[in-house]
Amino acid sequence: MRNGFGKTLSLGIQHVLAMYAGAIVVPLIVGKAMGLTVEQLTYLVSIDIFMCGVATLLQVWSNRFFGIGLPVVLGCTFTAVSPMIAIGSEYGVSTVYGSIIASGILVILISFFFGKLVSFFPPVVTGSVVTIIGITLMPVAMNNMAGGEGSADFGDLSNLALAFTVLSIIVLLYRFTKGFIKSVSILIGILIGTFIAYFMGKVQFDNVSDAAVVQMIQPFYFGAPSFHAAPIITMSIVAIVSLVESTGVYFALGDLTNRRLTEIDLSKGYRAEGLAVLLGGIFNAFPYTAFSQNVGLVQLTGIKKNAVIVVTGVILMAFGLFPKIAAFTTIIPSAVLGGAMVAMFGMVIAYGIKMLSRIDFAKQENLLIVACSVGLGLGVTVVPDIFKQLPSALTLLTTNGIVAGSFTAVVLNIVYNVFSKAKKIEQEADLAEQKTAV
Protein backbone atom coordinates (compact mmCIF):
# COMPACT_ATOMS: atom_id res chain seq x y z
CA MET A 1 0.00 0.00 0.00
CA ARG A 2 2.84 2.37 0.99
CA ASN A 3 4.75 1.61 -2.21
CA GLY A 4 1.61 2.19 -4.28
CA PHE A 5 1.02 5.59 -2.68
CA GLY A 6 4.70 6.50 -3.09
CA LYS A 7 4.50 5.77 -6.80
CA THR A 8 1.27 7.76 -7.16
CA LEU A 9 2.83 10.67 -5.25
CA SER A 10 5.98 10.68 -7.42
CA LEU A 11 3.87 10.62 -10.60
CA GLY A 12 1.75 13.47 -9.25
CA ILE A 13 4.90 15.53 -8.59
CA GLN A 14 6.04 14.83 -12.17
CA HIS A 15 2.78 16.27 -13.50
CA VAL A 16 3.22 19.36 -11.29
CA LEU A 17 6.76 19.91 -12.63
CA ALA A 18 5.60 19.39 -16.23
CA MET A 19 3.06 22.22 -16.00
CA TYR A 20 4.72 24.45 -13.37
CA ALA A 21 6.69 26.66 -15.76
CA GLY A 22 3.57 27.40 -17.82
CA ALA A 23 1.54 28.01 -14.66
CA ILE A 24 3.88 30.63 -13.18
CA VAL A 25 4.92 32.44 -16.37
CA VAL A 26 1.41 33.70 -17.17
CA PRO A 27 0.80 35.50 -13.82
CA LEU A 28 4.34 36.90 -13.89
CA ILE A 29 3.83 38.37 -17.38
CA VAL A 30 0.36 39.75 -16.68
CA GLY A 31 1.19 41.00 -13.18
CA LYS A 32 4.30 42.88 -14.28
CA ALA A 33 2.53 44.35 -17.32
CA MET A 34 -0.29 45.68 -15.10
CA GLY A 35 2.22 47.23 -12.67
CA LEU A 36 1.37 45.12 -9.61
CA THR A 37 3.44 45.47 -6.44
CA VAL A 38 5.69 42.61 -5.30
CA GLU A 39 3.12 41.65 -2.64
CA GLN A 40 0.30 41.63 -5.20
CA LEU A 41 2.40 39.67 -7.69
CA THR A 42 3.20 37.07 -5.03
CA TYR A 43 -0.51 36.70 -4.30
CA LEU A 44 -1.31 36.43 -8.01
CA VAL A 45 1.17 33.57 -8.48
CA SER A 46 -0.04 31.85 -5.27
CA ILE A 47 -3.72 32.03 -6.16
CA ASP A 48 -3.01 30.90 -9.70
CA ILE A 49 -1.18 27.78 -8.50
CA PHE A 50 -3.98 27.09 -5.99
CA MET A 51 -6.71 27.52 -8.61
CA CYS A 52 -4.83 25.27 -11.06
CA GLY A 53 -5.27 22.56 -8.43
CA VAL A 54 -8.96 23.37 -7.92
CA ALA A 55 -9.62 23.44 -11.67
CA THR A 56 -7.86 20.10 -12.12
CA LEU A 57 -9.90 18.43 -9.36
CA LEU A 58 -13.15 19.81 -10.80
CA GLN A 59 -12.34 18.17 -14.13
CA VAL A 60 -11.16 14.82 -12.71
CA TRP A 61 -14.13 14.50 -10.33
CA SER A 62 -16.77 13.20 -12.72
CA ASN A 63 -20.35 13.51 -11.48
CA ARG A 64 -23.76 14.07 -13.05
CA PHE A 65 -23.22 17.85 -13.30
CA PHE A 66 -19.59 18.43 -14.29
CA GLY A 67 -16.18 16.79 -14.76
CA ILE A 68 -15.04 14.70 -17.72
CA GLY A 69 -13.29 12.15 -15.49
CA LEU A 70 -10.10 11.91 -17.57
CA PRO A 71 -6.49 12.29 -16.31
CA VAL A 72 -6.36 15.93 -17.40
CA VAL A 73 -4.46 18.79 -15.73
CA LEU A 74 -5.79 22.34 -16.07
CA GLY A 75 -3.66 25.47 -16.08
CA CYS A 76 -3.95 29.14 -17.01
CA THR A 77 -4.24 29.65 -20.73
CA PHE A 78 -1.67 31.65 -22.73
CA THR A 79 -4.55 32.80 -24.91
CA ALA A 80 -5.64 35.17 -22.15
CA VAL A 81 -2.29 36.97 -21.68
CA SER A 82 -2.58 39.72 -24.31
CA PRO A 83 -6.32 40.38 -23.77
CA MET A 84 -5.87 40.61 -19.97
CA ILE A 85 -3.01 43.09 -20.36
CA ALA A 86 -5.04 45.15 -22.86
CA ILE A 87 -8.14 45.18 -20.64
CA GLY A 88 -6.08 46.01 -17.55
CA SER A 89 -4.38 48.92 -19.31
CA GLU A 90 -7.65 50.32 -20.68
CA TYR A 91 -10.15 49.62 -17.89
CA GLY A 92 -8.21 48.50 -14.80
CA VAL A 93 -7.74 45.24 -12.89
CA SER A 94 -11.34 45.09 -11.62
CA THR A 95 -12.65 44.92 -15.20
CA VAL A 96 -10.20 42.13 -16.04
CA TYR A 97 -11.83 39.93 -13.41
CA GLY A 98 -15.34 41.08 -14.20
CA SER A 99 -14.85 39.94 -17.80
CA ILE A 100 -13.38 36.60 -16.65
CA ILE A 101 -16.39 35.99 -14.38
CA ALA A 102 -18.78 36.80 -17.23
CA SER A 103 -16.92 34.52 -19.66
CA GLY A 104 -17.02 31.69 -17.10
CA ILE A 105 -20.80 32.04 -16.80
CA LEU A 106 -21.06 32.04 -20.60
CA VAL A 107 -19.05 28.81 -20.86
CA ILE A 108 -21.30 27.13 -18.27
CA LEU A 109 -24.39 28.20 -20.24
CA ILE A 110 -23.12 27.09 -23.66
CA SER A 111 -21.65 23.84 -22.29
CA PHE A 112 -25.01 22.14 -22.87
CA PHE A 113 -24.80 22.58 -26.63
CA PHE A 114 -21.22 23.63 -27.44
CA GLY A 115 -20.46 20.17 -28.82
CA LYS A 116 -22.85 21.01 -31.67
CA LEU A 117 -20.98 24.28 -32.38
CA VAL A 118 -17.56 22.67 -32.88
CA SER A 119 -18.22 22.65 -36.65
CA PHE A 120 -17.82 26.45 -36.54
CA PHE A 121 -14.25 25.97 -35.25
CA PRO A 122 -12.51 23.56 -37.66
CA PRO A 123 -8.66 23.39 -37.87
CA VAL A 124 -8.61 26.28 -40.35
CA VAL A 125 -10.08 28.52 -37.62
CA THR A 126 -8.39 27.11 -34.52
CA GLY A 127 -5.03 26.76 -36.29
CA SER A 128 -5.19 30.39 -37.43
CA VAL A 129 -6.20 31.58 -33.95
CA VAL A 130 -3.45 29.62 -32.15
CA THR A 131 -0.86 30.87 -34.65
CA ILE A 132 -2.01 34.46 -34.09
CA ILE A 133 -1.83 33.96 -30.32
CA GLY A 134 1.79 32.84 -30.54
CA ILE A 135 2.72 35.70 -32.87
CA THR A 136 1.09 38.38 -30.69
CA LEU A 137 2.88 37.04 -27.60
CA MET A 138 6.38 37.21 -29.14
CA PRO A 139 6.86 40.97 -28.49
CA VAL A 140 6.35 40.23 -24.77
CA ALA A 141 9.11 37.61 -24.95
CA MET A 142 11.49 39.92 -26.81
CA ASN A 143 10.96 42.79 -24.34
CA ASN A 144 11.72 40.46 -21.44
CA MET A 145 14.84 39.13 -23.16
CA ALA A 146 16.16 42.68 -23.18
CA GLY A 147 15.49 43.10 -19.46
CA GLY A 148 11.85 44.11 -19.34
CA GLU A 149 10.10 47.06 -20.93
CA GLY A 150 11.08 50.32 -19.24
CA SER A 151 14.00 48.84 -17.28
CA ALA A 152 17.16 50.93 -16.86
CA ASP A 153 19.35 48.23 -18.41
CA PHE A 154 17.02 47.45 -21.33
CA GLY A 155 19.00 45.82 -24.14
CA ASP A 156 22.12 45.43 -22.01
CA LEU A 157 24.48 42.73 -23.26
CA SER A 158 24.27 40.87 -19.94
CA ASN A 159 20.48 40.53 -20.30
CA LEU A 160 20.72 39.27 -23.86
CA ALA A 161 23.50 36.82 -22.93
CA LEU A 162 21.42 35.48 -20.03
CA ALA A 163 18.30 35.11 -22.18
CA PHE A 164 20.12 33.28 -24.98
CA THR A 165 21.85 31.04 -22.42
CA VAL A 166 18.45 29.96 -21.08
CA LEU A 167 17.12 29.44 -24.60
CA SER A 168 20.21 27.40 -25.54
CA ILE A 169 19.82 25.19 -22.45
CA ILE A 170 16.19 24.47 -23.37
CA VAL A 171 17.12 23.69 -27.00
CA LEU A 172 19.96 21.36 -25.91
CA LEU A 173 17.75 19.55 -23.40
CA TYR A 174 15.12 19.02 -26.10
CA ARG A 175 17.80 17.67 -28.44
CA PHE A 176 19.80 15.40 -26.14
CA THR A 177 17.38 14.22 -23.44
CA LYS A 178 14.32 12.00 -23.47
CA GLY A 179 11.30 11.26 -21.36
CA PHE A 180 10.58 13.24 -18.22
CA ILE A 181 13.71 15.45 -18.37
CA LYS A 182 12.68 16.56 -21.86
CA SER A 183 9.16 17.37 -20.66
CA VAL A 184 10.48 19.72 -17.93
CA SER A 185 13.28 21.27 -20.01
CA ILE A 186 11.75 24.77 -19.80
CA LEU A 187 11.58 24.58 -16.00
CA ILE A 188 15.20 23.37 -15.86
CA GLY A 189 16.26 26.19 -18.18
CA ILE A 190 14.59 28.77 -15.90
CA LEU A 191 16.22 27.28 -12.77
CA ILE A 192 19.72 27.21 -14.30
CA GLY A 193 19.25 30.71 -15.73
CA THR A 194 18.20 32.08 -12.32
CA PHE A 195 21.21 30.36 -10.70
CA ILE A 196 23.56 32.03 -13.21
CA ALA A 197 21.76 35.38 -12.76
CA TYR A 198 22.38 35.19 -8.99
CA PHE A 199 26.14 35.32 -9.57
CA MET A 200 25.61 38.24 -11.95
CA GLY A 201 23.92 40.20 -9.16
CA LYS A 202 20.49 40.09 -10.81
CA VAL A 203 18.66 38.08 -8.12
CA GLN A 204 17.44 39.51 -4.80
CA PHE A 205 15.85 37.36 -2.09
CA ASP A 206 14.13 40.20 -0.22
CA ASN A 207 10.77 39.22 -1.74
CA VAL A 208 11.08 35.70 -0.31
CA SER A 209 12.03 36.79 3.21
CA ASP A 210 9.23 39.40 3.28
CA ALA A 211 6.53 36.98 2.10
CA ALA A 212 4.15 35.43 4.63
CA VAL A 213 4.60 31.77 5.53
CA VAL A 214 0.92 30.88 5.06
CA GLN A 215 -1.84 32.87 3.38
CA MET A 216 -5.46 31.88 3.01
CA ILE A 217 -7.14 32.61 -0.29
CA GLN A 218 -9.74 35.36 -0.45
CA PRO A 219 -12.30 36.36 -3.08
CA PHE A 220 -11.97 39.72 -4.84
CA TYR A 221 -8.46 40.40 -3.55
CA PHE A 222 -8.12 43.28 -6.04
CA GLY A 223 -11.54 44.74 -5.24
CA ALA A 224 -15.09 44.31 -6.54
CA PRO A 225 -15.29 43.33 -10.23
CA SER A 226 -16.43 45.78 -12.91
CA PHE A 227 -18.30 44.81 -16.05
CA HIS A 228 -17.99 46.39 -19.51
CA ALA A 229 -19.29 45.00 -22.79
CA ALA A 230 -16.12 45.07 -24.91
CA PRO A 231 -13.87 43.29 -22.34
CA ILE A 232 -16.58 40.68 -21.73
CA ILE A 233 -16.80 39.95 -25.47
CA THR A 234 -13.00 39.74 -25.66
CA MET A 235 -12.65 37.27 -22.78
CA SER A 236 -15.63 35.27 -24.07
CA ILE A 237 -13.79 34.77 -27.37
CA VAL A 238 -10.72 33.67 -25.38
CA ALA A 239 -12.88 31.21 -23.41
CA ILE A 240 -14.41 29.71 -26.57
CA VAL A 241 -10.99 29.29 -28.20
CA SER A 242 -9.81 27.56 -25.01
CA LEU A 243 -12.81 25.20 -25.18
CA VAL A 244 -11.86 24.23 -28.72
CA GLU A 245 -8.26 23.57 -27.62
CA SER A 246 -9.51 21.53 -24.66
CA THR A 247 -11.73 19.45 -26.95
CA GLY A 248 -8.62 18.22 -28.75
CA VAL A 249 -6.99 17.34 -25.43
CA TYR A 250 -10.10 15.46 -24.28
CA PHE A 251 -10.20 13.34 -27.44
CA ALA A 252 -6.44 12.65 -27.19
CA LEU A 253 -6.86 11.43 -23.60
CA GLY A 254 -9.95 9.47 -24.62
CA ASP A 255 -7.82 7.59 -27.15
CA LEU A 256 -5.05 7.01 -24.59
CA THR A 257 -7.50 5.63 -22.02
CA ASN A 258 -9.53 3.65 -24.59
CA ARG A 259 -12.66 5.58 -23.70
CA ARG A 260 -15.19 6.72 -26.27
CA LEU A 261 -16.35 10.21 -25.32
CA THR A 262 -20.03 11.05 -25.65
CA GLU A 263 -21.66 14.45 -26.08
CA ILE A 264 -22.66 14.28 -22.41
CA ASP A 265 -19.01 13.71 -21.41
CA LEU A 266 -17.91 16.73 -23.44
CA SER A 267 -20.67 18.88 -21.94
CA LYS A 268 -19.57 17.97 -18.41
CA GLY A 269 -15.97 18.73 -19.36
CA TYR A 270 -16.93 22.14 -20.74
CA ARG A 271 -19.03 22.82 -17.64
CA ALA A 272 -16.11 22.02 -15.32
CA GLU A 273 -13.90 24.34 -17.36
CA GLY A 274 -16.51 27.11 -17.16
CA LEU A 275 -16.79 26.63 -13.41
CA ALA A 276 -12.99 26.84 -13.14
CA VAL A 277 -12.98 30.09 -15.15
CA LEU A 278 -15.78 31.52 -12.97
CA LEU A 279 -13.89 30.66 -9.77
CA GLY A 280 -10.71 32.05 -11.33
CA GLY A 281 -12.46 35.39 -11.78
CA ILE A 282 -13.93 35.40 -8.26
CA PHE A 283 -10.57 34.64 -6.62
CA ASN A 284 -8.65 36.95 -9.00
CA ALA A 285 -6.75 34.24 -10.85
CA PHE A 286 -7.02 33.31 -14.55
CA PRO A 287 -9.11 31.50 -17.17
CA TYR A 288 -8.18 27.81 -17.23
CA THR A 289 -7.81 25.22 -19.95
CA ALA A 290 -6.51 21.67 -20.38
CA PHE A 291 -2.69 21.51 -20.54
CA SER A 292 -1.47 19.51 -23.52
CA GLN A 293 2.03 18.93 -22.05
CA ASN A 294 0.52 16.73 -19.35
CA VAL A 295 -1.10 14.58 -22.06
CA GLY A 296 2.41 13.86 -23.31
CA LEU A 297 3.41 12.82 -19.79
CA VAL A 298 0.45 10.42 -19.55
CA GLN A 299 1.54 8.88 -22.85
CA LEU A 300 5.17 8.77 -21.69
CA THR A 301 4.56 7.08 -18.32
CA GLY A 302 1.67 4.89 -19.48
CA ILE A 303 -0.07 5.61 -16.15
CA LYS A 304 -3.65 6.67 -16.85
CA LYS A 305 -5.14 6.57 -13.35
CA ASN A 306 -7.15 9.56 -12.20
CA ALA A 307 -5.68 9.09 -8.71
CA VAL A 308 -2.36 10.49 -9.98
CA ILE A 309 -4.09 13.65 -11.23
CA VAL A 310 -5.99 13.99 -7.93
CA VAL A 311 -2.61 14.00 -6.15
CA THR A 312 -1.38 16.60 -8.67
CA GLY A 313 -4.34 18.85 -7.88
CA VAL A 314 -3.86 18.51 -4.13
CA ILE A 315 -0.12 19.34 -4.41
CA LEU A 316 -0.90 22.45 -6.47
CA MET A 317 -3.47 23.62 -3.91
CA ALA A 318 -0.97 23.06 -1.09
CA PHE A 319 1.71 25.05 -2.94
CA GLY A 320 -0.75 27.90 -3.42
CA LEU A 321 -1.26 28.29 0.34
CA PHE A 322 2.43 29.08 0.94
CA PRO A 323 3.35 32.53 -0.47
CA LYS A 324 7.07 31.91 0.02
CA ILE A 325 6.90 29.31 -2.76
CA ALA A 326 5.26 31.88 -5.03
CA ALA A 327 7.74 34.56 -3.91
CA PHE A 328 10.59 32.44 -5.26
CA THR A 329 9.09 32.82 -8.73
CA THR A 330 9.11 36.62 -8.45
CA ILE A 331 12.92 36.67 -8.12
CA ILE A 332 13.34 35.22 -11.62
CA PRO A 333 14.95 37.99 -13.74
CA SER A 334 13.03 39.22 -16.78
CA ALA A 335 15.84 38.15 -19.10
CA VAL A 336 15.60 34.55 -17.85
CA LEU A 337 11.84 34.56 -18.39
CA GLY A 338 12.35 36.10 -21.83
CA GLY A 339 14.61 33.27 -22.96
CA ALA A 340 12.06 30.69 -21.80
CA MET A 341 9.18 32.65 -23.35
CA VAL A 342 10.76 32.54 -26.81
CA ALA A 343 10.66 28.74 -26.63
CA MET A 344 7.18 28.58 -25.07
CA PHE A 345 5.50 31.11 -27.33
CA GLY A 346 7.39 29.79 -30.34
CA MET A 347 5.92 26.37 -29.55
CA VAL A 348 2.46 27.96 -29.56
CA ILE A 349 3.13 29.26 -33.10
CA ALA A 350 4.48 25.86 -34.16
CA TYR A 351 1.43 24.11 -32.70
CA GLY A 352 -0.84 26.46 -34.65
CA ILE A 353 1.04 25.69 -37.86
CA LYS A 354 0.76 21.97 -37.07
CA MET A 355 -3.02 22.37 -36.76
CA LEU A 356 -3.11 24.22 -40.10
CA SER A 357 -1.18 21.39 -41.75
CA ARG A 358 -4.29 19.20 -41.39
CA ILE A 359 -6.43 21.36 -43.67
CA ASP A 360 -6.80 21.14 -47.44
CA PHE A 361 -4.83 24.06 -48.88
CA ALA A 362 -5.84 23.00 -52.38
CA LYS A 363 -9.05 24.88 -51.58
CA GLN A 364 -8.40 28.57 -52.23
CA GLU A 365 -11.02 29.44 -49.61
CA ASN A 366 -8.89 27.92 -46.83
CA LEU A 367 -5.84 29.83 -48.05
CA LEU A 368 -7.82 33.07 -47.93
CA ILE A 369 -9.18 32.37 -44.44
CA VAL A 370 -5.65 31.83 -43.08
CA ALA A 371 -4.21 34.75 -45.05
CA CYS A 372 -6.82 37.29 -43.91
CA SER A 373 -7.08 36.17 -40.27
CA VAL A 374 -3.33 35.85 -39.63
CA GLY A 375 -2.65 38.97 -41.71
CA LEU A 376 -5.16 41.11 -39.78
CA GLY A 377 -4.11 39.63 -36.45
CA LEU A 378 -0.45 40.41 -37.10
CA GLY A 379 -1.28 43.79 -38.67
CA VAL A 380 -3.31 44.97 -35.68
CA THR A 381 -0.53 43.78 -33.35
CA VAL A 382 2.08 45.80 -35.24
CA VAL A 383 -0.14 48.88 -35.78
CA PRO A 384 -2.60 48.88 -32.84
CA ASP A 385 -3.81 52.44 -33.51
CA ILE A 386 -5.17 51.67 -36.98
CA PHE A 387 -8.77 51.51 -35.71
CA LYS A 388 -8.54 54.14 -32.96
CA GLN A 389 -11.07 56.40 -34.73
CA LEU A 390 -13.80 53.80 -34.25
CA PRO A 391 -16.33 54.13 -31.38
CA SER A 392 -14.84 53.33 -27.96
CA ALA A 393 -17.06 50.24 -27.59
CA LEU A 394 -15.28 48.65 -30.56
CA THR A 395 -11.76 49.91 -29.89
CA LEU A 396 -10.64 47.12 -27.57
CA LEU A 397 -11.96 44.50 -29.97
CA THR A 398 -10.15 45.99 -32.95
CA THR A 399 -6.89 46.92 -31.23
CA ASN A 400 -6.27 43.35 -30.06
CA GLY A 401 -4.68 41.16 -32.73
CA ILE A 402 -6.03 37.92 -31.26
CA VAL A 403 -9.63 39.14 -31.24
CA ALA A 404 -9.41 40.76 -34.69
CA GLY A 405 -7.84 37.65 -36.23
CA SER A 406 -10.21 35.25 -34.46
CA PHE A 407 -13.30 37.18 -35.54
CA THR A 408 -12.03 37.25 -39.15
CA ALA A 409 -11.33 33.50 -39.16
CA VAL A 410 -14.76 32.59 -37.74
CA VAL A 411 -16.70 34.88 -40.11
CA LEU A 412 -14.80 33.78 -43.23
CA ASN A 413 -15.18 30.11 -42.27
CA ILE A 414 -18.95 30.61 -41.97
CA VAL A 415 -19.07 32.40 -45.34
CA TYR A 416 -16.87 29.95 -47.26
CA ASN A 417 -17.44 26.61 -45.55
CA VAL A 418 -20.62 26.57 -43.43
CA PHE A 419 -22.94 28.49 -45.78
CA SER A 420 -21.56 26.83 -48.91
CA LYS A 421 -21.96 23.39 -47.34
CA ALA A 422 -25.53 24.18 -46.31
CA LYS A 423 -26.28 25.47 -49.80
CA LYS A 424 -24.80 22.33 -51.35
CA ILE A 425 -26.96 20.11 -49.12
CA GLU A 426 -30.02 22.16 -50.07
CA GLN A 427 -29.21 21.83 -53.79
CA GLU A 428 -28.73 18.05 -53.45
CA ALA A 429 -32.07 17.79 -51.63
CA ASP A 430 -33.82 19.78 -54.39
CA LEU A 431 -32.22 17.56 -57.04
CA ALA A 432 -33.32 14.41 -55.23
CA GLU A 433 -36.84 15.81 -54.93
CA GLN A 434 -36.94 16.57 -58.67
CA LYS A 435 -35.80 13.04 -59.50
CA THR A 436 -38.48 11.62 -57.22
CA ALA A 437 -41.11 13.79 -58.93
CA VAL A 438 -40.00 12.54 -62.35
UniProtKB/Swiss-Prot annotation:
Any single Gene Ontology cellular-component annotation: plasma membrane
Localisation: Cell membrane
Record field: transmembrane: 11-31, 41-61, 65-85, 100-120, 121-141, 154-174, 180-200, 220-240, 272-292, 308-328, 331-351, 367-387, 396-416
Domain of life: Bacteria
Gene Ontology BP, a term: xanthine transport
One Gene Ontology term of the molecular function aspect: xanthine transmembrane transporter activity
Keyword tags: Cell membrane, Membrane, Transmembrane, Transmembrane helix, Transport
Membrane topology annotation: Multi-pass membrane protein
Classification via InterPro entries: NCS2, UacT-like, Xan_ur_permease
Similarity field: Belongs to the nucleobase:cation symporter-2 (NCS2) (TC 2.A.40) family.
Cited function: Transport of xanthine in the cell.
Name of the protein: Xanthine permease
UniProt organism field: Bacillus subtilis (strain 168)
